[in-house]
Structure formats: structure tokens, C-alpha cells
Amino acid sequence: MNLKFNTDYCIEEFLPTSIFSDLLNACDYYNLEKLISISESYVKQLNPFKEYIFFHEYYECFKWIYTYYSSFELPTLQSTEYIISLKNIINSNLYEVMMDLVFKKRTISGIYDFSYFDFKNSNSMINRGNHMMILYNQSKLSEMLDYCQDLEEEYSIKNNYIRLLDIYSLKGFAFSNTEKEKFEKLVSQINHTVEAHNSNIPKIKTSQLLKNIGLQAFRIDMYDIAINYFEQYIAMDSPYANIVGIDLCISYQKTNKINKLKSFIQSKEIYKGDGQYENLLNYFILKYKYQTDNDELSYFIVNKVPIIIDNTMGKYKQFFYEELSMLVEQTKRYKDLKTYLDSTSDMLPI
């Protein structure tokens, strides 16, 4: 794009320094109304000058901010390269807000090159939280927990309970199956914070928290906690309820809550999803549909379950392998699948 010089107007006339502090503060405290209001206002003001140097860069930034916080659409990967290049061109507080969007886009896209991000000592609370995620992805869990403790103290003092819950949500990833007491303590902290400050926490942040903690509880086999969080998440009418559907089915079965499982697989909303999701879900539907019909169940075991196992991974693969072993014994079809079971066991996660 060929940009022009403007000798009639100064960018500072349009953008007082205070506006960038307000913008960063709104980002840190997740004030959607203010983020949308500020960005929309400056998109309109800068639009007539968007073909001029400096005006163009600010116009594009405000447009990306407005687009993300009004419709949750992130910049393209190509745009993130451009945003990174603006470090010494645009206001530093605006750059912090933009780099949060860059971080979100690149991690969601599976790009884990963190050399562009210097968040550890950032003046932005949201980006210091992003530094926690970087430490997690680098498997620096001890350093992550130490850093987390500092953030917890700071965010509590500043009454930023939205970002405090973000920190708790990330902290859960650091705990393994052998640290269930620590995870239970974290869940207690989360419940206390949500109960005390629920009116100040946007629905979307509560929804994200319920999903993330539920998935973390499921990961370390704390199925009762997982069920509690998943059920609350689904009750909020989340458009992404199918994300936790299979995990909830497995959690119900692991805790022998079969009536709840049957009720869940009959609900309409669980059928939203891609082919892989529905394939996994059909296992539970068919298992309980055919539980009194040995011939049909045997056919399903022999012809369908191996396909499910071959097309899943990690915890799902382990679960369906165990299910197949159990169902084969129940229906006396072990001989038909002995070779398959033996070969598959080598591919299971340790």
C-alpha cells in the first residue's frame, strides 16, 4: 500500500496519550463496553486519514481491536507479522493491547515461537498472564507457579478478579494426577472468588473458566469435579457445549452415573459437532441402546469400536481400549479381536 504524508494534521491532535492508558486499562480489566466504544470512535475519526503514514497504522490497530472485542475475530496470521513490526512506531500501551491479539492468534494457530513476546515484565496485566502460558508451553512449571503467586497477590490487591480467574485457570494445567490435593485447593479458591465477585465477572469469562477447569479435572481423573464444571458450562447454553460432551460422558461412566449419562445422550444440543465428535458420541448411544442385544452389540464392537480407537488419541484412546476389552469379555467375542487388542496396546499412552 502506497501511503502518503500529511503535513496539515498531527497524529497527536487526534490521539491524546491518555486514550492509550484508558484502552490498556479496559483490556486488563476486560471492560468490553469501553474497548468497543474507544476503538469504534477512533476508527471513525481516523478513517478519512487512513491513507496517510502514521494515521494508517493507528487506524488499522483500532480496527483490529474493534473487530476482536465486538465479534471475537482475530487478525490474520499475515497481519500479526505487520503488527509485530509496529513496536517502535505506535504508542507503547497500544502495542501491548495489539500484542495480546497477536499472541492469541499465533497460539490458536499452533505457532509456538515466543521470541516476539517479552511479557514477563510487561506493564499489562493480560500480557503478564500470557507469560504464564509461555512458561507452561516451555514446560517450566516450577517457574510458572512462582510467577503465578506474584500475579495472584498483585491482581487481588488491584481487585482484578477477572484476570485472577484467568490465572487460576492456567494454574490448573501445572498439576498432575499425583497433585490432586493441590488441584482441590485451587478449585476451592476459584469457587470462593466466583461466589464473592460473580456480579463483576462477565458471562463469557465464567463460561471459559468452567470449561477449562472441567477439562483439567478430567485430565487428572477427578471426574466428580469435572462433572460439576461441565454441567454448569452446558447449563450456560454455551455454543461450544459439544467440546466437553465426550469428556462428560466418560466422567459419568467412570463415576457410575449411568442414568445421568443416558439423559445426557438423549438431549438435542449434544448432536452439534463434527464427524469425529459424533463418532465418539455414537459409541455411548449405541452401547446403551444395544446393551440387551448381544448380536448387535457384538457387531458394533467388532466393526465400529476399533475404528474409534484408531482415530482417537491420548486419554480417549486409553478409555476406548479399556471399553473394548471389557465389552469383548462380556459378549464372548474376545477371540475375534485378540490380535487387534494385542497390537493396539503398544500404541496406548503411558
Which stretches of residues belong to each language-model region?
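Canonical BTB/POZ domain core
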Residues: 1-41
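Residues that mark the junctions of alpha-helical repeat units in TPR/alpha-solenoid scaffolds
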Residues: 16, 54, 58, 91, ...
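Structural motif corresponding to the intra-repeat A-B loop/turn of tetratricopeptide repeats
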Residues: 30, 105, 138, 177-178, ...
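Alpha-helical repeat scaffolds
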Residues: 35-42, 73-87, 109-120, 142-153, ...
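"A position-specific structural signal for the A-helix of alpha-solenoid helical repeats
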Residues: 59-64, 97, 101, 126-133, ...
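Residue at a conserved register position within TPR or TPR-like alpha-solenoid repeats
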Residues: 102, 135, 155, 168, ...
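TPR/Sel1-like alpha-solenoid repeat signature
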Residues: 171, 210-217, 229, 248-252
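C-terminal non-catalytic interaction modules
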Residues: 282, 287-289, 296-350
